[in-house]
């Protein structure tokens, strides 16, 4: 898989969660902030990143930098995905199903952020298992990574698209 240069894309960013985390030391607790950010160009490219710092803006900046290093390309057919798929990460599972035009993005919280920034306009989704935002985002990204267009599947099997689709 080739890497995607974030400088050539006009990326939008969306903060999914900001979490206050603590390190317990002899004198008490040391607080820091962990941010989960999704970036995308609404045209088939999306990525997520995590950052941690003592201040919220700095954590977000680090997360955006990390997200730009982890961009993936998503196959989009018209305004939806090529086929249904279940993305898995940890105990989080995300079921993604193509939808007809005009349906919109039917997804909750973290999954919606990923799908909208990827540029998918019509899709149905269901979050199963863990509702932890990090697991939800990673499961969604895993699902989108495993999507393939009909042409790619036909080429892998050595058949024509007509033979494949029947």
From Swiss-Prot:
Keywords per UniProt: Ribonucleoprotein, Ribosomal protein, RNA-binding, rRNA-binding
Gene Ontology terms, MF aspect: rRNA binding; structural constituent of ribosome
One of the Pfam families matching this protein, by short name: Ribosomal_S5_C
One annotated GO biological process: translation
Domain spans labelled S5 DRBM: 11-74
Coiled-coil parts of chain: none
The keyword Ribonucleoprotein appears for this protein: yes
Keyword check for Lipid metabolism: no
GO CC terms of this entry: small ribosomal subunit
Organism domain of life: Bacteria
PROSITE patterns: RIBOSOMAL_S5, S5_DSRBD
NCBIfam families, A to Z: rpsE_bact
Subunit structure: Part of the 30S ribosomal subunit. Contacts proteins S4 and S8.
Function summary: With S4 and S12 plays an important role in translational accuracy. Located at the back of the 30S subunit body where it stabilizes the conformation of the head with respect to the body.
UniProt record similarity statement: Belongs to the universal ribosomal protein uS5 family.
Protein known as: Small ribosomal subunit protein uS5
């Amino acid at each position: 898989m080739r890497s995607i240069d974030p400088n050539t894309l006009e990326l939008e960013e969306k903060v999914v969660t900001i979490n206050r985390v603590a390190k317990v030391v002899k004198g008490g607790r040391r607080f820091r902030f962990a941010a989960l950010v999704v970036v995308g160009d609404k045209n088939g490219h999306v990525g997520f990143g995590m950052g941690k710092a003592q201040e919220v803006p700095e954590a977000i900046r680090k997360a955006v930098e990390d997200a730009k290093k982890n961009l993936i390309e998503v196959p989009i057919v018209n305004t939806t995905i090529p086929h249904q798929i279940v993305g898995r990460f940890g105990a989080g599972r995300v079921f993604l199903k193509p939808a007809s035009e005009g349906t919109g993005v039917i997804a909750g919280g973290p999954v919606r952020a990923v799908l909208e920034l990827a540029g998918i306009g019509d899709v149905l989704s269901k979050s199963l298992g863990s509702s932890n935002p990090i697991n939800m985002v990673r499961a969604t990204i895993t699902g989108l990574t495993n999507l393939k267009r009909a042409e790619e599947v036909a080429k892998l099997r050595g058949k024509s698209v007509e033979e494949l689709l029947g």
